[in-house]
From Swiss-Prot:
Key word Disulfide bond present: yes
Pfam family, one: V-set
Name this polypeptide is given: Ig kappa chain V-III region 50S10.1
Framework-3: annotated span: 61-92
GO cellular component: immunoglobulin complex
Region span, Framework-4: 102-111
Length: 111
């Protein structure tokens, strides 16, 4: 299975500032020039919400302050400017190989 190592485990960011979350895969998640890396946001009592798919594409209705980048094994999620509503858990997920696997999560809070 592809192992995803996400960092940091927790992050506190001031309103209006930038939050950056990293995800490293144990092997490349690229295939046919597509990066099979996705990012999800999860709030307590709610299902995960898809923010970013294929490394850099925004999900439906996702605000422009969420962006993704990276290729191969190294990826990042950026949130800028940070808003109060962005307090949540964030997870990377690879969808190159079954079983699809998730990173351990990052808890994002307001500083």
């Amino acid at each position: 299975d592809i192992v995803l190592t996400q960092s940091p485990a927790s992050l506190a960011v001031s309103l209006g500032q930038r939050a950056t979350i990293s995800c490293r895969a144990s092997e490349s998640v690229d295939n046919y020039d597509i990066n099979f890396m996705n990012w999800f946001q999860q709030k307590p009592g709610q299902p995960p919400k898809l923010l970013i798919y294929a490394a850099s594409n925004q999900g439906s209705g996702v605000p422009a302050r969420f962006s993704g980048s990276g290729s191969g094994t190294d990826f990042s999620l950026n949130i800028h400017p940070m808003e109060e509503d962005d307090t949540a858990m964030y997870f990377c997920q690879q969808s190159k190989e079954v079983p699809y696997t998730f990173g351990g999560g990052t808890k994002l809070e307001i500083k």
